[in-house]
Design a protein with these regions (language model features):
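The feature captures the conserved acid-bearing segment of alpha/beta-hydrolase catalytic domains
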Residues: 25-99
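Residue-level recognition of short, well-ordered coil/turn positions
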Residues: 22-23, 148
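Gly/Ala-rich beta-loop-alpha elbow adjacent to hydrolase catalytic centers
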Residues: 5-10, 14
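Active-site signature of alpha/beta-hydrolase-fold catalytic machinery across serine-
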Residues: 16-20
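Alpha/beta-hydrolase-fold serine-hydrolase catalytic core, especially in secreted/extracellular enzymes
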Residues: 96-156
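Active-site-proximal flexible loops/turns
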Residues: 15, 38, 103-106
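Divalent metal-coordination and catalytic microenvironments
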Residues: 2, 91, 140
Length: 156
């Protein structure tokens, strides 16, 4: 069984693989729009596929995008999953981190992350990354190894 994950546009590519490839069993997208689901543009609006997302997906968001998902048209597919009834679509908001704070760049170059995200993270980067790593591992364990039922953390 194959799981794929990525951050930002890499996560968009992972989401596309989950839709296109039959050998992908689960996808984790770290603050990534469903770009592959955009079928075209009609009167200035994105036209999205109506096909349900075919595999379990965990979407992880930072403060950078969480409050703007419904405003940003490239995130229309994400909003549909947030408000839909897909039984294996999970959405996790990690408060206190910015877009690059979802990556290990926060450990190797905290100053660069602070500059790129526009502010100092309100959450400790190590704590935030530990939460992301543990959640992603439990998600893949559940959907790739059939080790229990996945549940989001209670109070991230």
């Amino acid at each position: 069984r194959i799981g794929v994950m990525g951050h930002s546009l890499g996560g968009s590519a992972a989401l596309g693989m989950g839709r296109e490839r039959g050998d992908v069993s689960a996808v984790i997208a770290l603050e990534s729009p469903f770009m592959f689901d955009i079928q075209g543009v009609d009167h200035g609006e994105f036209v999205l596929t109506r096909e349900p997302y075919p595999v379990p997906v965990l979407n992880v968001y930072s403060d950078s995008a969480w409050g703007h998902l419904s405003e940003w048209p490239q995130y229309a597919g994400n909003v549909a999953l947030l408000s839909g009834d897909h039984p294996a679509a999970f959405n996790l908001h990690i408060d206190g981190l910015g877009h690059l704070g979802l990556t290990d760049l926060a450990l190797s170059s905290p100053l660069l992350v602070r500059l790129a995200d526009g502010a100092r993270p309100a959450r400790d980067s190590v704590e935030g990354l530990r939460l992301i790593n543990e959640t992603c591992l439990r998600f893949f364990d559940a959907y790739l190894k059939n080790h229990g039922k996945f549940q989001l953390p209670v109070a991230p």
